[in-house]
Structures are given as structure tokens and as C-alpha cells.
């Protein structure tokens, strides 16, 4: 089990202090609902060594090194523990000579998003659906004052805490295992990221409103999601699965997505990137035993999913509250 009290202390004197009215009780309830694997996963973090990195790079990667390299045996023990937390989906991480080669090259997405962002220096940042926290560390690397990630998945919390322990227990990033719908409206974050979440929502406009409720006035929303070609009235609603995912509900065109954001009261809305997901960005690795993108596409025509829908294409939209 993880101790969230250091986070409570961090936010007690910040603009997030109002969150303390609800958060401690919510996390106590969350702990009561965790399943047996969570206990096993959380104990793995205890088995990881207490290492002090002499060099940490969060600006160009998520990387930690010591002046004296670890022995082969030490590296193998760490790899053994980290592989018990598979699958590792978002990365990569480079920790003491260990390359955690995750399913997603999330650094590709970060390179696409970063040039368009309002500078993160000294900003309070929220990352919704943060997974194991790869992008959170990159946000810290850009100078964010504090990054809060929310994701209810127990495995992601354990992966995040494992990486944090190997990054000198850096407290500038914190993962809270809740969903956005469980957060009270704080209107406290300078930048809010929602990347790879919107299409999993049965009510996408509610999700956009929830994101808006966490932003300060004129704060920046960074929205990355699946899109399809089409006009302002085009939205794909898969009948069953999309790319073998059963929880995909709405995939709009870029113009439809901009219309949704306008309807929710955002302004200064602009699409800064559209990219088809490539096989070099999402693929099988030794850190993932599951299927990956190649298995989700039509083997005869990679421009379509295995169900016959357009292959995954992702847009990055920026907007202000």
C-alpha cells in the first residue's frame, strides 16, 4: 500500500488545498476496493533497491544513471522485479542501464505535442488518464512546478511508484488513482492534458466539461484523441469493437471535435497535429506479452482496422478555458 500523506502535505498550502475536503476519504475507499494483485504489485516496489542517481534526465528522456554502473547481477534483479509489473504500455524508460522498452514509444507523441504547448515552466499540471506516468516525468523535465496524474488502474500506480523510486523518489510528480469524474471541480490547474481518453468516454462532452472544470481561467487544454476524416457532422460510432477495443464510443472528425469544444465553452481552439499511428510507435516488445497494433489492423490493408474501420489516426487539439 502507498502512503498518500506526503501528497496531502504538498497540496495543503497550494491552490489544490480544497481537494483535501474529498480526496483522503476517496482514496481510503479506493484502497478497500483494490484486488489481490495490487497487494502483490505494491510489494514489488519494496524489493527494488534504494539507488541514488548521479544524473537524471527528464528533458530529453526519462533516464537515471550512476557514476558507477550496476553489476550485471544487480541489473538482472531489478529487471526481474520490473517484469513482474508487465505489461508496460507507455515509455520508454532508461534506468541504470536497463531499457524498459514499452509497447508505445510515448516519446514520439511528446515530440509532436511539446512544440505547440504554452511553456510548462512553474505550471501546475493535470494529466488525465496518465497511465504509468511517462508523460508526467517529461512535463517535470519541462519545468512544471507540480504534475498530478490521475488514473484508476492499480497496475499503473505501481509502475509509476517503481519508476519514482528509481528517480530518487522525486515528489514533483504524483499519481492519484481516481478517474476525472471523481474529482471535485478545482479550477486550479494551468495546463490539463487528456491524451488517449476521450474515445473511451460514453459522454465525450461531459468529459470535456470535466476537463474545463479543472482549469484556471485561460488555462490550456491539451487534447489528444482518435479522429476520422470528415466534416463537422462526421463522427464514427463503432458498432462493436474498434481495433479490438470494446470500449471505444465516439471518434469525431477534427471539425466535429472543434465544434464539441466550442459547445463546451472553450476558445482559441486549434488543431496542431494529425498523425496516423505507425507500427514503429506501437508494437510488441519483451515488456509486453499482449497483442499490439499489428494485430489490430487488417493484415491485407493496414489503412483499415481488423473490423474494417479507418486505421487509428490521432489529432492534437489545444484550447483555452
From Swiss-Prot:
Any Pfam family: Methyltransf_9
InterPro entries: CmoB (IPR010017), Mo5U34_MeTrfas-like (IPR027555), SAM-dependent_MTases_sf (IPR029063)
SUPFAM superfamilies named among the record's database cross-references: S-adenosyl-L-methionine-dependent methyltransferases (SSF53335)
GO terms, biological process: tRNA wobble uridine modification
Positions with a binding annotation for carboxy-S-adenosyl-L-methionine: 90, 104, 109, 129, 151-153, 180-181, 195, 199, 314
Catalytic reaction list: carboxy-S-adenosyl-L-methionine + 5-hydroxyuridine(34) in tRNA = 5-carboxymethoxyuridine(34) in tRNA + S-adenosyl-L-homocysteine + H(+)
Keyword tRNA processing carried by entry: yes
Top-level class of the enzyme under EC nomenclature: transferase
Gene Ontology MF terms: methyltransferase activity; transferase activity, transferring alkyl or aryl (other than methyl) groups
EC identifiers of the protein: 2.5.1.-
CDD domains: AdoMet_MTases
Function: Catalyzes carboxymethyl transfer from carboxy-S-adenosyl-L-methionine (Cx-SAM) to 5-hydroxyuridine (ho5U) to form 5-carboxymethoxyuridine (cmo5U) at position 34 in tRNAs.
Family designation: Belongs to the class I-like SAM-binding methyltransferase superfamily. CmoB family.
PANTHER family: METHYLTRANSFERASE, TRNA U34 CARBOXYMETHYLTRANSFERASE
Subunit structure: Homotetramer.
Protein name: tRNA U34 carboxymethyltransferase
Species for this entry: Histophilus somni (strain 129Pt)
Gene transcribed to yield this protein: cmoB
Amino acid at each position: 500500500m502507498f502512503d498518500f500523506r506526503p501528497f496531502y502535505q504538498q497540496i495543503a498550502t497550494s491552490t489544490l488545498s480544497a481537494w483535501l475536503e474529498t480526496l483522503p476519504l476517496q482514496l481510503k475507499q479506493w484502497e478497500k476496493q483494490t484486488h489481490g494483485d495490487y497487494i502483490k504489485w505494491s510489494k514489488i516496489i519494496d524489493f527494488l533497491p534504494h539507488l541514488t542517481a548521479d544524473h537524471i534526465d527528464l528533458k530529453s528522456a526519462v533516464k537515471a544513471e550512476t557514476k558507477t554502473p550496476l553489476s550485471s547481477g544487480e541489473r538482472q534483479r531489478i529487471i526481474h522485479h520490473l517484469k513482474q509489473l508487465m505489461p508496460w504500455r507507455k515509455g520508454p524508460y532508461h534506468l541504470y542501464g536497463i531499457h524498459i522498452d514499452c509497447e508505445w514509444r510515448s516519446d514520439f507523441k511528446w515530440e509532436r505535442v511539446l512544440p505547440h504547448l504554452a511553456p510548462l515552466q512553474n505550471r501546475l499540471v493535470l494529466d488525465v488518464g496518465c497511465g504509468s506516468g511517462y508523460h508526467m516525468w517529461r512535463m517535470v523535465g519541462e519545468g512544471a512546478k507540480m504534475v498530478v496524474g490521475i488514473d484508476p488502474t492499480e497496475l499503473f500506480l505501481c509502475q509509476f511508484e517503481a519508476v519514482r523510486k528509481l528517480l530518487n523518489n522525486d515528489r514533483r510528480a504524483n499519481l492519484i488513482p481516481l478517474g476525472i469524474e471523481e474529482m471535485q471541480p478545482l479550477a486550479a490547474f494551468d495546463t490539463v492534458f487528456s491524451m488517449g481518453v476521450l474515445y473511451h468516454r460514453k459522454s465525450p462532452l461531459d468529459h470535456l466539461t470535466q476537463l474545463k472544470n479543472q482549469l484556471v481561467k485561460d488555462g490550456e487544454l491539451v487534447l489528444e484523441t482518435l479522429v476520422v476524416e470528415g466534416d463537422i457532422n462526421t463522427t464514427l460510432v463503432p458498432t462493436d469493437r474498434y481495433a479490438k477495443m470494446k470500449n471505444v464510443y465516439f471518434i469525431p472528425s477534427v471539425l466535429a471535435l472543434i465544434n464539441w469544444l466550442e459547445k463546451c465553452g472553450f476558445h482559441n481552439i486549434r488543431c496542431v497535429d494529425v498523425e496516423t499511428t505507425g507500427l514503429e510507435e506501437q508494437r510488441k516488445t519483451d515488456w509486453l506479452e499482449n497483442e499490439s497494433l499489428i494485430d489490430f489492423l487488417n493484415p491485407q490493408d493496414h489503412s483499415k482496422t481488423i473490423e474494417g474501420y479507418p486505421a487509428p489516426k490521432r489529432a492534437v487539439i489545444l484550447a483555452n478555458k
